[in-house]
């Protein structure tokens, strides 16, 4: 049983404020939600279990029970998850406010302890205190958090997360902020709470506290496409696809890290809850993470033999050729931009090969093929440039004044001609390595200009950013045949 979840269940009965703040979906009637096999900690109830995707950010961070309330750590409504979420620079005063909130919501005194002990129905002698009966009293106050970095902003979701060594398939990593506060001050807070417990429970409380307050922070994870809902990934091939998200909002006027102070003024807190509402947004999937996902999918389907072939058709339109025919049944080809990039890249590469190397048929086995497999993966800059350099070297370049040149005198299509004119100002007869890199980047950047793309999708934006973009009609950046350059 998750300690934080149990504490919320029992403590929500002590007053009206707690009944509102500590209400968790996991402690209420179960409602069905999409099942998944992702393992990790639910940010809402802090238990380690199977996770489903959040309706606010499409990432996997909520359990199937808590998903019924649709809470996200990026919300603007002061629910418990939002009040436990801190952003970027966290100060000692911020952590003091967090500890004060814990003390208000989970008080520990003689009256509370006696009340819980008397209300507990034990199956053995009442004089014997067992941890499974009093799990809710064994919630220490720690500065343990799950952190994530989203486009330069770092979020810390504080809580009490059991079983830290369990499988974690989420983009969140454990971070300990006790050094920002003060170990001794935090010790005093917990020793004072522990003193009200029966002697048989004090040792367990101490073990839990020290294990969660003295651990070494994990290295922060990189967010990738696998951390987002499979429903989003399955529709990436559609250029006009928009992600539907919902956010819980209110007229929250505090600074981000001061939301936890709201519980100190109960009447003001309930007044703010009266302004709570749900906002709906349709946002674009355009970002580096999803772009790299699509380009990698296309890279797996590459037929490098086309660059030595004599086919009169475009690379994606070759049929009945054992070495060059692309399997068009994959959904990645439904995105016309991917097909354009693939056709133009291979039209340009074939012109380079035919201009410099005497290879007459696509059935021949050439060393250059092994370097062609990475020509679409421009998001991995170092690996991509290495593959282009190896391709260039396979063309047997001529060195003149420490600069290597290759010929370029084979026919190309009109799309590639336009790219050449825009990128280097003319259709040249010779090319350097830098020219080749520039041209191939331009072919890809025409449709996916990753230089100006955010890393994560807009679903990870805060409410303030979403509102500003919505006002400027920029939340839906779908393409109707319009490229990045246009």
Curated annotation (Swiss-Prot):
Region (Interaction with host IRF3): 317-486
Stretches for region Important for cytoskeleton localization: 82-176
Keywords per UniProt: Host cytoplasm, Host cytoskeleton, Host-virus interaction, Inhibition of host innate immune response by virus, Inhibition of host IRF3 by virus, Inhibition of host IRF7 by virus, Inhibition of host NF-kappa-B by virus, Inhibition of host RLR pathway by virus, Interferon antiviral system evasion, Metal-binding, Phosphoprotein, RNA-binding, Viral immunoevasion
GO cellular component labels: host cell cytoplasm; host cytoskeleton
Residue window of motif pLxIS motif: 480-483
Subunit structure: Interacts (via C-terminus) with host IRF3; this interaction leads to IRF3 degradation. Interacts with host IRF7; this interaction leads to IRF7 degradation. Interacts with host CUL1 and CUL3. Interacts with host BTRC.
Family: Belongs to the rotavirus NSP1 family.
Its job: Plays a role in the inhibition of host innate immunity by inducing the degradation of key host factors required to activate interferon production such as IRF3, IRF5 or IRF7. Associates with components of cullin RING ligases (CRLs) including CUL1 or CUL3, which are essential multisubunit ubiquitination complexes, to modulate their activities. Recognizes the host NF-kappa-B regulator BTRC through the presence of a DSGXS motif in the C-terminal substrate recognition domain.
The protein's name: Non-structural protein 1
UniProt source species: Rotavirus A (strain RVA/Human/United States/P/1974/G3P1A[8])
Upper lineage: Viruses, Riboviria, Orthornavirae, Duplornaviricota, Resentoviricetes
């Amino acid at each position: 049983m998750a300690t934080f979840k149990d504490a919320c269940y029992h403590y929500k009965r002590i007053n009206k404020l707690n009944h509102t703040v500590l209400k968790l979906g996991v402690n209420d009637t179960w409602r069905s939600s999409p099942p998944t096999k992702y393992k990790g900690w639910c940010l809402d109830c802090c238990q380690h279990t199977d996770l489903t995707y959040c309706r606010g950010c499409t990432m996997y961070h909520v359990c199937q029970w808590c998903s019924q309330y649709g809470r996200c750590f990026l919300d603007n409504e002061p629910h418990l998850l939002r009040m436990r979420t801190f952003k970027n620079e966290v100060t000692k005063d911020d952590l003091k406010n967090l500890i004060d909130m814990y003390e208000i919501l989970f008080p520990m005194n003689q009256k509370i302890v006696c009340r819980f002990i008397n209300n507990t129905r034990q199956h053995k002698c009442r004089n014997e205190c067992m941890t499974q009966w009093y799990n809710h009293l064994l919630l220490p106050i720690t500065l343990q958090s799950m952190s994530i970095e989203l486009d330069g902003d770092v979020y810390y979701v504080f809580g009490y997360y059991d079983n830290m060594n369990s499988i974690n398939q989420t983009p969140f990593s454990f971070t300990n902020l006790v050094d920002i506060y003060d170990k001794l001050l935090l010790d005093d807070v917990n020793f004072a709470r522990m003193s009200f417990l029966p002697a048989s429970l004090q040792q367990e409380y101490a073990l839990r506290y020290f294990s969660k307050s003295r651990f070494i922070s994990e290295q922060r994870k990189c967010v990738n496409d696998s951390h987002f809902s499979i429903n989003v990934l399955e529709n990436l091939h559609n250029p006009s696809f928009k992600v539907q998200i919902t956010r819980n909002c209110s007229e929250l006027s505090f600074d981000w890290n001061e939301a936890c102070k709201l519980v100190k003024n109960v009447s003001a807190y309930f007044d703010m809850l009266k302004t709570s509402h749900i906002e709906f947004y349709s946002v674009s999937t355009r970002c580096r993470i999803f772009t790299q996902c699509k380009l990698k999918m296309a890279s797996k389907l590459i037929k490098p033999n086309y660059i030595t072939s004599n086919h009169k058709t475009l690379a994606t339109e070759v049929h009945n050729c054992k070495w060059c025919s692309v399997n068009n049944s994959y959904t990645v080809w439904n995105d016309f931009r991917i097909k354009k990039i693939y056709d133009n890249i291979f039209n340009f590469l074939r012109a380079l090969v035919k201009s410099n190397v005497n290879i007459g048929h696509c059935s021949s086995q050439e060393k250059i093929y092994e370097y062609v497999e990475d020509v679409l993966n421009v998001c991995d800059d170092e690996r991509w440039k290495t593959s282009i350099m190896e391709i260039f070297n396979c063309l047997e370049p001529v060195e003149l004044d420490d600069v290597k040149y290759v010929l370029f005198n084979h026919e190309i299509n009109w799309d590639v001609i336009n790219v050449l004119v825009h990128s280097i100002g003319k259709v040249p007869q010779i090319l350097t390595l830098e020219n080749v890199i520039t041209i191939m980047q331009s072919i890809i950047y025409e449709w996916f200009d990753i230089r100006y793309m955010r890393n994560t999708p807009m679903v990870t934006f805060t409410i303030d950013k979403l509102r500003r973009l919505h006002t400027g009609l920029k939340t839906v950046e779908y393409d109707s045949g319009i490229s990045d350059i246009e």
